[in-house]
């Protein structure tokens, strides 16, 4: 038994790498068991081992060499599609089709596949009429047919190029000539007709199928708008889940790739990734809807307003039962916003059991240990039939069990709607940390394998969404779409009217970084805008959750905006003033890991508000040019992560101190980088390459009142403070005094200043 176990353990051995022109392969040796006839006569007759009775066969082992491509030219990667089909390596085909947009266009891949490898009537083939040539042509034909079938089935959106659909037309012409009447030809023809029909509907003013609408339902009837209190909590949660699931199922997974998402704010790409933008818009609409319903009626009494908050907490709990983590997070974030949290009298009227329920729901999105709770929950319940809830509150536990039992009795299975920012942040971090090319200019396909791990999770959860069996409620959707949403300034002003600001002598919690964020960076990718000046009244941290630096801050104010300035609210007004600061210090060292589902190329170092209004489009910095570093494919160094130094690399975030707010850009720092080189790379990413680099200095933010100036001759990797967040500022030299004067003229009593101040107003400045 021990020998058998050892044989199984050694059945696969790592053999190293093979390098050939245009490609690098990873080689493994695998022992494969084969059955042969026990006597020579049967073997001479060609009798297969599986055709003989037991006892007449003998087991033998054969060693097979398996090559997995790690990097290569585009030609080699496309050629490997054919060999992968022959080796039954369908995983490679899925990885390539899901990620090739990061290094090639649909036209380039299609031309290589069809013109170079798919020309079965070339002169060479015609001259050689041997049987082996015919068999080879048949093998290639079957391989190409299988690849095209998978392409049309898995990535149909690649061919959506209205109005003429050139790639789809080229593919259809090829299939008509080379494979008439085949299944791929029928699929291509049906897809072309579908695209053309949708284009006609769009031209006629009908809603596009890639955005959420009630296109399959009758028009909403007019009439008086219903009141929010008229809708039951389970109905609201079900309708929100219906809308979220419809949008999530339409998300094109490869649009989430960091290399694609980072191009969205270019002028020519304003229509890029519409399915993701629609999901973001729905998230933000719900967040603002929660705030509007709570603040909307000035005539409401404190008890009535508390009832509305209680209702939203119950709706969030129903969303949890439905495994709708997108709406759950939106509601929690809205209730944590500054304009809602500051209503102390209102929160005091919320029943204690609902406050405890709210804390438990908020803890799901705790950033402790790189958002471990939400990750484990998603992995555990992603494809399960029902939610699995455990509550420390007895009343909540009983209510949950009753609801779950009712679902089981009715035979209703639930899908899962994830928080999309989880995947976007992961893919953005992967794109930032891993190189596109290795030595020799070969495409780093190992990076694409890592990205596919995230893409595969998106596709799996999209399939799980088909388990939902819900129909739209016209009355609720009409109410939801007609809600008048408030801007951040409007909501805060209204909040102050409802409950006046506390006196200066009143003890209030210190500013903190919330553990729950909203989709405010989905339009920012690796860029994050932060609010440098905390308001007077800020929410406190949860009684049990941790706060601090979060890499899961992905959100957007509106579908049309590219940037979002922010601050964030909190969870419970139960803490004492000293508790939030203690929790903040305990959790400030938390960081994100690159292999996880919730990383981002940049985290948040200041407060984020789910209800922020976008700044002027004229002030939006252009997207940075993506730099390509050349590294060896044989490197075994772990990918760098934010807020953590590996052996000789790490990721830092750099913002420019100006009047447009603080937008962070992520930069990979090595142990060899000097200050001038880091400044030049930061200027390139912030589109400041036209300015002289000598005019700027690099400053690390130590705390709210301390900063560290990196000397021009220093090695940044060793000069920086590795015990605090890796947040830096690119500042013009000799501008400190002028900026402090500007800040001193800004009112300190208003909750929001007319012009954003800079981070330069700190009490202590450390110079090496």
Swiss-Prot record:
It holds the Pfam family RasGEF_N. Residues 528-623 are annotated as: Disordered. Residues 232-501 form the Ras-GEF domain. GO terms for biological process: Ras protein signal transduction; small GTPase-mediated signal transduction. Residues 648-735 form the Ras-associating domain. One of its GO terms (molecular function) is guanyl-nucleotide exchange factor activity. Residues 541-561, 586-596, 605-621 have a biased composition (Low complexity). The modification Phosphoserine is found at residue 520. This is Ral guanine nucleotide dissociation stimulator-like 1. It comes from Homo sapiens (Human).
